[in-house]
Structures are given as structure tokens and as C-alpha cells.
Curated annotation (Swiss-Prot):
GO molecular-function terms, A-Z: dihydrolipoyl dehydrogenase (NADH) activity; flavin adenine dinucleotide binding; NAD(P)+ transhydrogenase (Si-specific) activity
Gene this chain is encoded by: sthA
Co-factor requirement: FAD
Keyword Cytoplasm: yes
Catalysed reaction equations from the record: NAD(+) + NADPH = NADH + NADP(+)
Lineage: Bacteria, Pseudomonadati, Pseudomonadota, Gammaproteobacteria, Vibrionales
Family of this protein: Belongs to the class-I pyridine nucleotide-disulfide oxidoreductase family.
Binding site for FAD: E36, K37, E38, S39, S40, V41, G42, G43, G44, C45
Name of the protein this chain belongs to: Soluble pyridine nucleotide transhydrogenase
Organism: Vibrio parahaemolyticus serotype O3:K6 (strain RIMD 2210633)
Coiled-coil positions: none
């Protein structure tokens, strides 16, 4: 008789990657358990990352909209809110998402195991529960989907009450008047938008020479300008020498000799995979210096019955991609190999204020590859829908091949950019001659809409040809 604690597959981690894998496996008829170290499902994406930061950003953008609209803001009075005030909105969304995801497991008869997992042999794990008790479970196969956490350098005192990372910032109790954000990646830039939108004096320290250098240069420059225009102080090419917590704030000493002081500091420079507590050495696996695992096209690690997906395998480290990887690994386990793979051009959504989204090549990449491309642009300020909504900051840029008219890249900066991008992405994904900028000229768009930006940009680009 089969052991009661034995499963076909055990998934470790209930974030997007783990959820995608568990749902795919249970729907294929396998007996699946999923281990979650926290008290509720969803992983870092739901509780500390994507969901709360975007909920905070939405609340702040609505406050900005209210204060900039003369219909609402009269007699020179403005609506003010603190970080603590808007955290309530984020927690409401987190609770809704958690209940929704809990329902997925309940309806699909997927066993939930709460506790911290570690391997004890190649086919068994021990799960340490909150009360200190440990239970052993075995499986034919495992999927590691433990995600990542903020990188914490050893010389920074994260126990100090004024020094935070992107997880602990959600437990911010006081209301700072001045914040230093160290690290100007996606997370750092998003939180810079949030805090500056709340009227908090914000210093953004960038270890690179430009913001989000993987973006198209024009988009990166646009973000830098809007940060500057809103009062964010950006310091590029800087590295900390020492971060010193004081009684009522933080002082950061930079290697360039500069010193800065603020009420608190958010350290947002890098992430590391959650593999250190898995006892990987027991099964013959080893993570790299970033805590990440290497996998093949079927998401198998060096141990063929142990798979890994999501942040724990590195690029692209996106919630959307992690869920797809989870679905693909379910195919690999049930059918011998994955039937689908991540698309080549994965869209990027960055929830700054204004929003940013890109898919495909940048101008600098096309120039370096000597591709004969042309540019089509549409400014939001010229769109009727943007004027009506008072959201006239931003633009859409389409990069296309001069000869074939093939769309090579799309870059959007402004309100709803992450939604707008998918219209162009759908055309880019078409095969052969179906991927053409002329589609947008020959298609009727609703009017007025933000989607009309595609028609305007297409006409603008085609008019440049000769």
C-alpha cells in the first residue's frame, strides 16, 4: 500500500511558478502537494512584491490625479496621504488575491503543506511547521519554485529600525519626510515614484550610469526627466562605502566622498534565490553565488527528477514568465518534454509614474546590429482620449524594418503603458508578413481611445519612408 505521505509531485513554493506547475499537474490527474513556508499562499509576488507595490502605486497615482484636477482640488487645498495610509489599500488587495489563490488549490484537490521544506534524500523532504514539529513527505518528482528575496549585504544593519529592504518596507511604521533609495533598478524606481508621489523628499542612488539601462535610451531619458521634474534627486554611478543608522535616521557615505542623510533608507539593489534552506547538497545540487539553479529546456536541474522555475532560475525573473514556466514544467513532467517555451520577446512592465512598457528590440540594439529600421511616434498629448482623461504625458514608439515593414520593437511611456503594449505585441507575434506596421494603418480603431496611438505612430513612421 502506498505511503500516505507520498505524492507524484511535490512543488516547493506557491508563488506564480509554483502555482502554474501545481495547477497543470493536478489537472493532468497527478497527486500533487505544494509546500508554502508562509501562513498563506501566493508567495513573494502576492505578499511583498508585485501586488502590494502596484496597489501602492495605484493609490498614489489617484492622489496625484485628484490634486492636479481643478474639478476636485479647489481653494488651493490638496489631498494628502502617508505611506501608512495607503498600505491599507495594498493589504485589501493582498487578502483578495490570497483568497482567490487558495480557492484554486481547494477546487483542484491539491494538498497544501505549510512549513519550511528541506531535502533529506533524493526523494524525500522534511517540512518544519511553525510549532517546530517536522513531517516527512516523499515524491517521485519535485519542482523548486521558492522564488527570491532582497539581497542583504552583510555590512548593512537591516535590524536597524530605519533601514529597510523591499520586503520590510511594507511594515514601515513611521511617516518619513525624506527617504534615500539605494539601487535604481525596477524596484527602486517604482518606490521612488511612490514616495515622491506622497510628497516625500526622495534621493535615488543609482550604481549605473543611467536609469534602467536595458530600456530604449529615449524611454530611460524620459523617466529621468520626469523624476527630475517631480523633484527626485538622482545620483548616477555611485556606490556606498558605509550605511550608518542613527537614532532618528540614516547617513549613507558614498565612495565618491559624498554623504547624505535621511529619515530612512530603502536598500533595493539586487535579489538572491531562496535556495539556502533547501539542503541542496543532500541531493547533489549546488546553487550559484546568487542562489540560483541551472536548468535545461525542460526546466530539469542536474538531478533529472528535480525541476526548478521562476526567480530561482534567474532571467527573466518576472511573475508573468514564472507562471508560464510552471505550466511548461507540468508539460515536461506529464509528457516527457515541454510542448511550449517562453516567447522570445517577453514584454516588460515597469510601474513607475508614468508607467513604462517595452517589447522587442531597442534603438541601440538595432543600430548595433546594423538593421535598417525606422521609427514611428505618437505623443499622448495629441490623442483625444488622453486629453479627456488628463493623461497627456507620454508616447508610443514603434520600431520597424524599412524594407519589410516588420515590427521590431515597441516602447511605451505613460498611463496604461503596460496594457497598451499588448496590442502591438499581438501583431509582433504573428508569423511572416502578418507582422507588419501597415496593420495599424488598415485597421479601424475605436475613437477616442489610447489604442489609437498605434495608428498615429504607424502613419508617422510610414511617412518617413522614401
Amino acid at each position: 500500500m502506498a505511503h500516505v505521505n507520498h505524492y507524484d509531485v511535490i512543488v516547493i513554493g506557491s508563488g506564480p511558478g509554483g502555482e502554474g506547475a501545481a495547477m497543470g499537474l493536478t489537472k493532468a490527474g497527478l497527486n500533487v502537494a505544494i509546500v508554502e513556508k508562509e501562513s498563506s499562499v501566493g508567495g513573494g509576488c502576492t505578499h511583498w512584491g508585485t501586488i502590494p507595490s502596484k496597489a501602492l502605486r495605484h493609490a498614489v497615482s489617484r492622489i496625484i490625479e485628484f490634486n492636479s484636477n481643478p474639478l476636485f482640488c479647489r481653494n488651493n487645498t490638496s489631498l494628502h496621504a502617508t505611506f501608512s495610509d495607503i498600505l491599507g489599500h495594498a493589504k485589501t488587495v493582498i487578502d483578495k488575491q490570497t483568497r482567490l489563490r487558495q480557492g484554486f488549490y481547494d477546487r483542484n484537490d491539491c494538498t497544501l503543506l505549510f512549513g519550511t521544506a528541506r531535502f533529506i534524500d533524493t526523494h524525500s523532504i522534511a517540512v518544519m511547521q511553525n510549532d517546530g514539529t517536522e513531517e516527512t513527505y516523499s515524491a517521485d518528482k519535485f519542482v523548486i519554485a521558492t522564488g527570491s528575496r532582497p539581497y542583504r549585504p552583510s555590512d548593512v544593519d537591516f535590524l536597524h529600525e530605519r533601514i529597510y529592504d523591499s520586503d520590510s518596507i511594507l511594515s514601515l511604521k513611521h511617516d518619513p519626510r525624506h527617504i534615500i533609495i539605494y539601487g535604481a533598478g525596477v524596484i527602486g524606481c517604482e518606490y521612488a515614484s511612490i514616495f515622491r508621489g506622497l510628497g516625500v523628499k526622495t534621493d535615488l542612488i543609482n550604481t549605473r550610469d543611467r536609469l534602467l539601462e536595458f530600456l530604449d535610451n529615449e524611454v530611460s531619458d524620459a523617466l529621468s526627466y520626469h523624476f527630475w521634474n517631480s523633484g527626485v534627486v538622482i545620483r548616477n554611478d555611485e556606490t556606498y562605502e558605509k550605511i550608518e543608522g542613527t537614532e532618528d535616521g540614516v547617513i549613507i557615505h558614498l565612495q565618491s566622498g559624498k554623504k547624505m542623510r535621511a529619515d530612512c533608507l530603502l536598500y533595493a539593489n539586487g535579489r538572491t534565490g531562496n535556495t539556502d534552506k533547501l539542503s541542496l547538497d543532500v541531493v547533489g545540487l549546488e546553487s550559484d553565488s546568487r542562489g540560483q539553479l541551472k536548468v535545461n529546456r525542460n526546466y530539469q536541474t542536474a538531478v533529472e527528477h528535480i525541476y526548478a522555475v521562476g526567480d530561482v532560475i534567474g532571467y527573466p525573473s518576472l511573475a508573468s514568465a514564472a507562471y508560464d514556466q510552471g505550466r511548461f514544467v507540468a508539460q515536461a513532467i506529464t509528457k516527457g518534454q515541454a510542448e511550449n517555451y517562453l516567447i522570445e520577446d517577453i514584454p516588460t512592465g515597469i510601474y513607475t509614474i508614468p508607467e513604462i512598457s517595452s517589447v522587442g528590440k531597442t534603438e541601440q540594439e538595432l543600430t548595433a546590429a546594423k538593421v535598417p529600421y525606422e521609427v514611428g511616434r505618437s505623443s499622448f498629448k495629441h490623442l483625444a482620449r488622453a486629453q479627456i482623461a488628463g493623461k497627456d504625458v507620454g508616447s508610443l514608439k514603434i520600431l520597424f524594418h524599412r524594407e519589410t515593414k516588420e515590427i521590431l520593437g515597441i516602447h511605451c511611456f505613460g498611463e496604461r503603458a503596460a496594457e497598451i503594449i499588448h496590442i502591438g505585441q499581438a501583431i509582433m507575434e504573428q508569423k511572416g508578413q502578418a507582422n507588419t506596421i501597415e496593420y495599424f494603418v488598415n485597421t479601424t480603431f475605436n475613437y477616442p481611445t489610447m489604442a489609437e496611438a498605434y495608428r498615429v505612430a504607424a502613419l508617422n513612421g510610414l511617412n518617413r519612408l522614401f
